[in-house]
Structures are given as structure tokens and as C-alpha cells.
From Swiss-Prot:
InterPro entries (alphabetical): EF-4, EFG_III/V, EFG_V-like, EFTu-like_2, G_TR_CS, LepA_C_sf, LepA_CTD, LepA_IV
Any one GO molecular-function label of the UniProt entry: ribosome binding
Keywords: Cell inner membrane, Cell membrane, GTP-binding, Hydrolase, Membrane, Nucleotide-binding, Protein biosynthesis
Recorded catalytic activity of this chain's protein: GTP + H2O = GDP + phosphate + H(+)
CC per GO annotation: plasma membrane
CDD domains: EF4_II (cd03699), EF4_III (cd16260), LepA (cd01890), lepA_C (cd03709)
Role noted for this protein: Required for accurate and efficient protein synthesis under certain stress conditions. May act as a fidelity factor of the translation reaction, by catalyzing a one-codon backward translocation of tRNAs on improperly translocated ribosomes. Back-translocation proceeds from a post-translocation (POST) complex to a pre-translocation (PRE) complex, thus giving elongation factor G a second chance to translocate the tRNAs correctly. Binds to ribosomes in a GTP-dependent manner.
Binding site for GTP: D14, H15, G16, K17, S18, T19, N131, K132, I133, D134
Protein name per the record: Elongation factor 4
Source organism: Paraburkholderia phytofirmans (strain DSM 17436 / LMG 22146 / PsJN) (Burkholderia phytofirmans)
E.C. number(s) listed in UniProt: 3.6.5.n1
GO BP of this protein: positive regulation of translation
PANTHER family given in the database record: TRANSLATION FACTOR GUF1 HOMOLOG, CHLOROPLASTIC, TRANSLATION FACTOR GUF1-RELATED
Chief location category: membrane
Length: 597
């Protein structure tokens, strides 16, 4: 066990984490040169394309150190994005050490800091590494100063390397062997194994990636999940040397996989503890929590006959993404679809993109909403994740909205515009610190404001230099109202939004004006109204198309013309009673793009 090292790599997006992982695998001879492709560990096409890591992956490697000893290195690649922070904390709790990779030309960024703090809280030793030192813009002294300033760990002897050229990567491995402690654990104790990740394989069912903390596991053992209590016989155990390789047993300190014929992913929850049925562990490993979705949106197929196909594709996606929630939903305007819950905005985009790309779905998505806590007059509290389910204003005592703590990092030049943005989004400033050229701002902002377009606008006002991460803080009472859109007196449920009262008038007017442009003129007048409860806050009219009925009257008596006009008016009135207005697709998409001023 003294020769095992478990480590993961922490880095901000694009700081070269996956490339460094590739180099390490190459040096340790995990794959032949023929099988080496860039970003070996990012197995989804989408991961390669966006250059982000979504699922955790591992590689068990052997490294012959300069002192002649052979070490077993278990590398656990973690996702770097804030939406997947729970997966990161699970991956980190399976390690004793973490490489903190910082781009020498860019310095420290928000998500690096967030994940690094997670690592320090979990008692993981953090080893700083400066990457991309081959770039002409690299400034290692500055980066070292920033690491010490912002994160507060000693970085004077940080290893310099360039993952792209392979320069200095061996020094990184040497530092790893020297500084990371070997795992603790007793191979003879009752089995405790932490599930780091799990995914669905078409041939063998669910594959669980585990870190064995205590005990030993062999094929044919019966295992039990401690959170769900389900039992399964083990079929195979083994490790990934990126390729899977079956072993006789896995014992304390190792990271490997278990295949046990599990049919659905919900049974193998990330963070759960696996133990043996006949010799159970007295207690599960700490830190398991059910992941709750934070952002909700409706997904509807463009063609109604695609509903079943959408359901099947969501089921298939859920096999590989346990944090995705969905339930059927009917909207009068959009037909049948699903209400889906996501961990955050990136997660939502990825799910949409995978549905469109891997399953060829054409989708309409409604505006993303967050979960509100509503205290009713009769004393009951309900959670509302869909504006259509919001009770009448007369029944509501108070509405509480989720507040998130947002950490923002940016160069000094952009502080002013970022503060303006946060104030527009009803944020309150908690803290502001200067670290050299970088500034760290901490704000509390309602989550509903963050999910709409906060991230895009932050990037555009700071020219892409600002970075952010957020975490849920609490529910707080707020003056939020539901704005409904009526078309000729009929409510269109898919267009309802929940906004703060101060923005409700503006929002109602904007949406009404936008719809007036997009709904084609009918044969009768169409009234578009925005309402809060029974109060109408905005109205737009679409004038009717009409035939000139007076064209054939030359001169003649006024009463003759009046008669024809009255007759036309009566006809239009009759039409209005039976006619229904088709709302084009563009109208729904336009609503999502109404900017909050």
C-alpha cells in the first residue's frame, strides 16, 4: 500500500488539465502510441468539442520513479465546472492529493479556487503546477504570487511544465510521489467503498467507479448499497488503465470498477458506500447527499408525434446522468412535453445539446425557472418549480426565492461594469478583495436572476475575463409576482414568468410588444394582455385585416355605407368568438430573449 498514490487534477476550463492527463498516461505507458488520441479521458464527443470534462474518469498507471521504485498511480479526472461541484467533491474525497494546474499566462480563475477550497476542506494535499510555460505570454512569477495570494498555499517550489510539449511532466510525477501521502485503510476490515461515479454500459449494465477505503472485494461477493439497501452479486472487478482490465480482487487504497448486473443508475448513487452483505460496515462513509436540481425548464417536441421519442431519449440520457429529473407536463400552447430539472445552466445546455445531437430531437424549451417556496394563507408551504403551478395571489402569504452566493473574479478594469450588472440583478455586495491585478467580488444574488442570462452578460461586459462560481445559500422572502400573458382573454400558460414586482411592468410591456410583432395579423382584432392576478399591466392590439366593403358604393347615401360597415363589424365579432390564434414558434423563443434592463 505504501506504493499507491491516489490523486486528481484540479483546473479551470482550458488550463490544460486533460492534456496533462494525456501526457501522464503516455509517460506511464497506459496506452500504446497508436491508441493515444488527444484528451483520452474525455469520452463524450461533446466533452471534446467544448473542451470540458463532464463525467469523472480514472486511470490506474504504473510509474517507475527516479529512485528505482515502482509506484501505482491512480488518476481521477474531475469535472471543472461549477454545475458538477458535487461530482468534484466525490472525486476529491477519494484522493489523498490533488494537482492544482494553473495556466501560467492567465493565473488563478474562479472555478479553480472553488474546487481547490473543496479539496482543502476534505483534507487533500494540494500540489501547485504551472502549465503552459512554453507560451510567450507565460508569467510564472505572477501566477505563483496569485496562487499564494488567493488560495493561500505555499507555491514557491511549484513545478513548471508544459503539457503540450511534455516538458517537465516527469517532474510533476516526481513531486506527486514525494508529496502525496499513501492511502490509509485496512484490507482486513469490513468493506467500505465510495462510489465516485457510475455509468450505464449497454452490455454489462451499470459500471461503478469506486475507491476502496477499507476491506477487500472479489468477484462473486454479494454487495449492498448503504443508501438504498439494494443487494447485488459482483460479476467483475478491475481497474482502468484507460482500457478496462479485470482483476482477481480490489483491496483498500485502490481505485477501480465494479460490475454487478445493476439495471438502473438510480441504484448506484454517486457518493454512496458499498459494503458486503455478510460482513457489513458499521456505518457509511460521510458526505453522501442527494443532488437536488436547481434549475427547471419545460422541454417540448416541435412535432406532437415526437413525444414518445422524446420520452425514450430522456430515459436513455438518465441512464448516464442520475442528476437529471423529468416529469410529463401538458401545456395548452405547446402540447405534451416534460418538465426537466437540472443542476445548473451548463447542465441544461448539455442535456439539450445531447438530445438534439445524439437523438435527433427538435425541441422547444421554455424559459428556465428556479424553485420558489410559497407559504399559503392556510399555513401550508409548497415548492413551485413551474410558473403555471403558482397559486392565486389572494392565497399567498409570502413567496421565498432561492438566494445564491456568487464569487466573481476579474481584472481590475472591469470591476465597475460587473458591479453595475450585479446591482441590476438585485444583488447585495458581501465582500470585495484585491489580489494584485485580480479582484474578487462576493455577492448574494437571487438565483432566478442568475439563471436567465447572468453568465452571458458577465462574459460580454468583461470581454471574457471574468469568471464566476455560485452556491445555494438560503430561501428568502421576496416580492415576486407571476406575470401571465392573455391572448384574446385566454391564458397562454407557456409564456407565464415569475419576476420581481419592480420588473413586472417592464417585463409585461416588453413581452406584449414582442408578441405583437410576431403574431401574424388575423381577420379580427387580437388583444395581447399581460396580467398579474386580475390586474392588467400592459396591452397591445393587433389590428384586423379587413376588406374595403365601401369600394362598390359610388357617392350614395351615408346610411348605405353605415349598414355595410356595421355588417362587417358584426361578422368580425362573430369570427372573434370562434377563432383561435396560432402562436408561432418564434414567439416562444423571443420571450426567452427579452432582456432585463
Amino acid at each position: 500500500m505504501d506504493h499507491i498514490r491516489n490523486f486528481s487534477i484540479i483546473a479551470h476550463i482550458d488550463h490544460g488539465k486533460s492534456t496533462l492527463a494525456d501526457r501522464i498516461i503516455q509517460i506511464c505507458g497506459g496506452l500504446s502510441d497508436r491508441e493515444m488520441e488527444s484528451q483520452v479521458l474525455d469520452s463524450m464527443d461533446l466533452e471534446r468539442e467544448r473542451g470540458i470534462t463532464i463525467k469523472a474518469q480514472t486511470a490506474a498507471l504504473t510509474y517507475k520513479a527516479r529512485n528505482g521504485e515502482v509506484y501505482n498511480l491512480n488518476m481521477i479526472d474531475t469535472p471543472g465546472h461549477v454545475d458538477f461541484s458535487y461530482e468534484v467533491s466525490r472525486s476529491l474525497s477519494a484522493c489523498e492529493g490533488a494537482l492544482l494546474v494553473v495556466d501560467a499566462s492567465q493565473g488563478v480563475e474562479a472555478q479553480t479556487v472553488a474546487n481547490c477550497y473543496t479539496a482543502i476542506e476534505l483534507g487533500v494535499d494540494v500540489i501547485p503546477v504551472l502549465n503552459k510555460i512554453d507560451l510567450p505570454a507565460a508569467n510564472p512569477e505572477n501566477a505563483i504570487a496569485e496562487i499564494e495570494d488567493v488560495i493561500g498555499i505555499d507555491a514557491t517550489d511549484a513545478t513548471h511544465c508544459s503539457a503540450k510539449t511534455g516538458l517537465g511532466v516527469e517532474d510533476v510525477l516526481e513531486a506527486l510521489v514525494a508529496k502525496v501521502p499513501p492511502p490509509k485503510g485496512d484490507p482486513e476490515a469490513p468493506l467500505q467503498a465510495l462510489i465516485i461515479d457510475s455509468w450505464f454500459d449497454n452490455y454489462v449494465g451499470v459500471v461503478m467507479l469506486v475507491r476502496i477505503v477499507n476491506g477487500t472485494l472479489r468477484p462473486k461477493d454479494k454487495i449492498r448499497m448503504m443508501a438504498t439497501g439494494a443487494q447485488y452479486p459482483v460479476e467483475h472487478v478491475g481497474v482502468f488503465t484507460p482500457k478496462s482490465k479485470n482483476l482477481e480482487s480490489l483491496s483498500a487504497g485502490q481505485v477501480g470498477f465494479i460490475i454487478a448486473g445493476i439495471k438502473e443508475l438510480a441504484a448506484a448513487k454517486v457518493g454512496d458506500t458499498v459494503t458486503l452483505v455478510n460482513r457489513p460496515a458499521p456505518e457509511p462513509l460521510p458526505g453522501f447527499k442527494e443532488v437536488k436540481p436547481q434549475v427547471f425548464a419545460g422541454l417540448y417536441p416541435v412535432e406532437a408525434n415526437q413525444y414518445d421519442a422524446l420520452r425514450d431519449s430522456l430515459e436513455k440520457l438518465k441512464l448516464n446522468d442520475a442528476s437529471l429529473m423529468y416529469e410529463p407536463e401538458v401545456s395548452q400552447a405547446l402540447g405534451f412535453g416534460f418538465r426537466c430539472g437540472f443542476l445548473g445552466l451548463l447542465h441544461m445546455e448539455i442535456v439539450q445539446e445531447r438530445l438534439e445531437r445524439e437523438f435527433d430531437m427538435d425541441l422547444i424549451t421554455t424559459a428556465p425557472t428556479v424553485v420558489y417556496e410559497v407559504l399559503q394563507r392556510d399555513g401550508t408551504t409548497i415548492m413551485v418549480e413551474n410558473p403555471a403551478k403558482m397559486p392565486e395571489p389572494s392565497k399567498i402569504e409570502e413567496v421565498r426565492e432561492p438566494i445564491v452566493t456568487v464569487n466573481l473574479y476579474m481584472p481590475q478594469d472591469y470591476v465597475g461594469s460587473v458591479i453595475t450588472l450585479c446591482t441590476q440583478k438585485r444583488g447585495t455586495q458581501i465582500n470585495m478583495q484585491y489580489h494584485g491585478r485580480q479582484v474578487q467580488l462576493t455577492y448574494e444574488i437571487p438565483m432566478g436572476e442568475v439563471v436567465l442570462d447572468f453568465f452571458d452578460r458577465l462574459k460580454s461586459i468583461s470581454r471574457g475575463y471574468a469568471s464566476m462560481d455560485y452556491e445555494f445559500k438560503e430561501y428568502r422572502a421576496a416580492d415576486v409576482v407571476k406575470v401571465d400573458m392573455l391572448i384574446n382573454g385566454d391564458k397562454v400558460d407557456a409564456l407565464s414568468v415569475i419576476v420581481h414586482r419592480s420588473q413586472s411592468q417592464y417585463r409585461g410591456r416588453e413581452v406584449a410588444a414582442k408578441m405583437r410583432e410576431l403574431i401574424p395579423r388575423q381577420m379580427y382584432d387580437v388583444a395581447i394582455q399581460a396580467t398579474i392576478g386580475a390586474n392588467i399591466i400592459a396591452r397591445e392590439n393587433i389590428k384586423a385585416l379587413r376588406k374595403n366593403v365601401l369600394a362598390k358604393c359610388y357617392g350614395g347615401d351615408i346610411s348605405r355605407k353605415k349598414k355595410l360597415l356595421e355588417k362587417q363589424k358584426a361578422g368580425k365579432k362573430r369570427m372573434k368568438q370562434v377563432g383561435s390564434v396560432e402562436i408561432p414558434q418564434e414567439a416562444f423563443l423571443a420571450i426567452l430573449r427579452v432582456e432585463d434592463k
